């Protein structure tokens, strides 16, 4: 391989000549330090290289060596509960090697531990036919995730030899007799991050993902295999929404990509997740989490790689048949990295200086999410759910990143700074947000809960929309101008907002609400509104209704803090609502006139 020579350094972009043997997307070692870079443009024998580390001190004349390989990730046991940087360097190992709390440059570290032994149990026998995607053995990586070792893409033949026992990830565990001869394989695969892993078939997602957040699960649900965007201004709670979903979503694995956001937020995850218990498995949340940290003070170019690194790892576990959620916080910082590199390459800018290909790059990322049938004999079904925060400057969702994102995602959770200022969290605006999965999820849950979930959700949304129209009248002519029925609608909507949609992420009980509890809580509020309207139509006064239901309304408000084991109390409360309102009808209204 030829050795190139640096001719220009411009921040994270380096131009090197004498690179005619190299190809686009090749990884290079740049300068005397050997920092890692990727070729993003070729003009004659001059390569433009985006460097994933700090370029301070690198100058013209220093060597550039191309590896001839694209940016790839290592896929093997040892990924879970690890924290990597944007190009899959393990941060704890980095600290052990460099004895520094800061990222040194040009440090060459294996992404996964080559020393640690894993117990490999074969699931196929010698002589069996295998092809790409077939499972040849399993490793119990964490108490809840069984790591399935799959035949690499492009390989098919007969098992010639397979071992059982404890092995490191780079030791040979099986060999396959192929048309070209016998090939040996370890537990590790490498895969280029910019290329999606092949699948057998893409399915239409229908199964809802339970997040435990009432406003999401009820009004704006997402399915396993769906894609959602969480745009909002600073301080509206994007990161807390993502952390909540990462903690409580009923998926098998979470890949959390901190892309250009504050380092403190990744520290929060590292401190909180090991202590929290997953409600579905009873194990520590860290046993199902992979972290990719590319904080705002890390090199800009590595942000661009971190999103691809995360989605490739997610695809690997999806191919095993797991449901995976990938959180990207935030894609706006990723788009800013694209904008910076595009500007340094002197490309023609599009809207607000972003490159013209911003939309296609975003679509490329989101289209790698979905519910699929993976390669392999057993037709495993797996899914990737992509949930990304978008940070539009000033909360302006008409800017290019948000608009291009909304074209490709089907769920929009719009965060509202006014709700956040009122301390209403999660501050998802129920009048602006939408989910295009609502119909499928409603039909699915009507069957699962054996009830009228879709009708309850529609009624709840109708009340909230009616409230916004009535508020206009109240602002103009005052609340006294409203009829008793309209005042009850406002009271029911207030209960929906404060007792149902508002949720305390820092309360041990309220942080997560099961689907059953959500249905019972929503039924309570709607029953109160429905029975109250009946009472008013029979002549009861609004003031009498409010005075007679103070204790009932207080108990509805406190129902969110009721533990999951005591849900039968909600059934009793529902019966009491009806009884209490019947007593008010019997005592009051026109009979006292």
Swiss-Prot record:
Pfam families named among the record's database cross-references: ATP-synt_ab, ATP-synt_ab_N, ATP-synt_ab_Xtn, ATP-synt_VA_C
Binding site for ATP: 232-239
Record's catalysed reaction(s): ATP + H2O + 4 H(+)(in) = ADP + phosphate + 5 H(+)(out)
A GO biological-process term: proton motive force-driven plasma membrane ATP synthesis
GO cellular component terms given for this protein: proton-transporting ATP synthase complex
Keywords, comma-separated and alphabetical: ATP synthesis, ATP-binding, Hydrogen ion transport, Ion transport, Nucleotide-binding, Translocase, Transport
The enzyme's E.C. designation: 7.1.2.2
GO molecular function terms attached to this record: ATP binding; proton-transporting ATP synthase activity, rotational mechanism; proton-transporting ATPase activity, rotational mechanism
InterPro entries: ATP-synt_VA_C, ATP-synth_a_Xtn, ATP_synth_asu-like_sf, ATPase_a/bsu_AS, ATPase_F1/V1/A1_a/bsu_N, ATPase_F1/V1/A1_a/bsu_N_sf, ATPase_F1/V1/A1_a/bsu_nucl-bd, ATPase_F1/V1_b/a_C
Role description: Produces ATP from ADP in the presence of a proton gradient across the membrane. The V-type alpha chain is a catalytic subunit.
Family the entry assigns: Belongs to the ATPase alpha/beta chains family.
Protein name, UniProt field: V-type ATP synthase alpha chain
Organism of provenance: Enterococcus faecalis (strain ATCC 700802 / V583)
